[in-house]
Amino acid sequence: LQPHQLRAVDEADALATKIVALDGFLKGPVFRQLDVAERDRLRRQYGLMGQYLAVLHERIAAFQ
């Protein structure tokens, strides 16, 4: 893989790790104590991170 392709793979790996961590937070007790607006922002962030990861996976698949 080219250097820019390797960076995309690394970025996808790092993002996947962050998504797992955020998912755990969203299921935890602290999340339920946050105000409604902050919970909404975090849920939207989670969804957008998933979309971002999907695009990275599409890009990586196209490297083949």
Predicted regions located by residue number:
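Extended, charge-rich alpha-helical interface modules
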Residues: L1-Q64
